[in-house]
């Protein structure tokens, strides 16, 4: 996976005088699974459609497997796209839907039959070939849509929120199916979603987008454990990272809601009294038994989820905080607990949102 599959160089997109994609540079390794994730309107689908050739590039270049495809038609780019709407022909059987694109490309009948047979076997839809889309479940229709992409034998698969129309249980099973498909085929896959769970579970690398810009690129672990800024910290993770207003005291210490906490950072670019944000994920908080560095928190609501409780708390200065509580006696609403944070999981952000540690 060292060769480059897709390269985006200073990609820009404008609608009239409004620029919506602002000079994006990305190198996507061949055979990798990359997920574009971000809130609605961040530009992720627009970026995918530019790679597909369905949206004109205002400026910049797109390469696929070393070939400049910026001005090529979608059919000449070596890509296949899977949409959230399935885009199946209702009057055709599954077999005919799978074969349609190949017939339009004047592929020989024997080759069409072989590709349809192979794709239906991979997706386990052999028994559905004579049915029409209206006779299929949502998950089955999505498999057929993916099958239409597979038969084209593309260099790159593009997925635009393919699971958004499915219920929660089906989304889980289809995530597993898509991950298995990637392992079997080994093609480069670029996947767009607003669902961070899909991003974390499917991706080799995640690209977090906001307002047409890349906020961070990295492995799921890198993005989760070391978010580049407050936006990424708050977007990736469920529940989100606690981001608490704090004051820099110098010598690697901050004051959070009246309590002092140490953080592994030098005083570079910080002045005593500067406002900062102290970050801690819910699962990195624990009830402190006599530990010096702890924060009192009043429990407003305790959410019991079997092996885990989520404690929705309020600090002395009114800031909200969520803690994950896995062991020990039950904690009830109205009680006050002392919370601390794993030393190596404490994060500090500047007032303008940059990660400092």
Predicted regions and their residues:
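ABC ATPase nucleotide-binding domain
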Residues: 7, 27, 63, 338-340
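ABC ATPase nucleotide-binding domains
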Residues: 33, 74-231
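The feature captures the beta-strand-to-loop junction immediately N-terminal to the Walker
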Residues: 37-39
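ABC ATPase nucleotide-binding domain helices that frame the ATP-binding cleft
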Residues: 45-48, 144
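Helix-to-loop junction immediately C-terminal to a conserved catalytic motif
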Residues: 52
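Conserved ABC transporter NBD signature motif
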Residues: 60-68
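Glycine/charge-rich catalytic "coupling/switch" loops of P-loop NTPases
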Residues: 253-301, 329-357
């Amino acid at each position: 996976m060292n060769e480059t599959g897709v390269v985006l160089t200073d990609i820009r997109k404008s609608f009239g005088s409004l620029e919506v994609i602002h000079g994006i540079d990305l190198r996507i390794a061949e055979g990798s699974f990359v997920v574009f994730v971000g809130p609605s309107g961040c530009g992720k689908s627009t970026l995918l459609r530019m790679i597909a050739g369905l949206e004109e590039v205002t400026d910049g270049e797109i390469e696929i497997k070393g070939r400049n495809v910026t001005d090529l038609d979608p059919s000449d780019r070596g890509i296949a796209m899977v949409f959230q709407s399935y885009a199946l022909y209702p009057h055709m059987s599954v077999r005919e839907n799978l074969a349609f694109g190949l017939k339009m490309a004047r592929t020989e009948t024997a080759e069409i039959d072989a590709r349809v047979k192979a794709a239906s076997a991979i997706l386990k839809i052999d028994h559905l070939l004579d049915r029409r889309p209206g006779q299929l479940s949502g998950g089955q229709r999505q498999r057929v849509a993916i099958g239409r992409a597979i038969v084209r034998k593309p260099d790159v698969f593009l997925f635009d929120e393919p699971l958004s129309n499915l219920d929660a249980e089906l989304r889980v099973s289809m995530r597993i199916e898509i991950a298995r498909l990637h392992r079997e085929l080994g093609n480069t896959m670029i996947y767009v979603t607003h669902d961070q769970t899909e991003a974390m579970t499917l991706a080799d690398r995640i690209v977090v987008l906001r307002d047409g810009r890349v906020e961070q690129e990295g492995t799921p672990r890198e993005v989760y454990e070391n978010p580049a800024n407050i936006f990424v910290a708050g977007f990736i993770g469920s529940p989100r990272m606690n981001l608490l207003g704090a004051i820099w005291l110098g010598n690697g210490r901050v004051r959070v809601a009246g309590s002092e906490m140490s953080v592994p950072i030098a005083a570079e670019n910080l002045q005593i009294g500067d406002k900062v944000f102290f970050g801690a994920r819910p699962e990195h908080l624990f009830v402190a038994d006599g530990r010096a560095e702890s924060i009192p928190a009043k429990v407003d609501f305790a959410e019991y989820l079997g092996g885990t409780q989520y404690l929705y708390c309020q600090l002395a200065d009114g800031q909200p905080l969520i803690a994950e509580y896995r062991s020990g006696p039950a904690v009830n609403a109205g009680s006050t607990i002392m919370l601390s944070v794993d030393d190596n999981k404490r994060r500090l952000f500047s007032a303008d949102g940059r990660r400092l540690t």
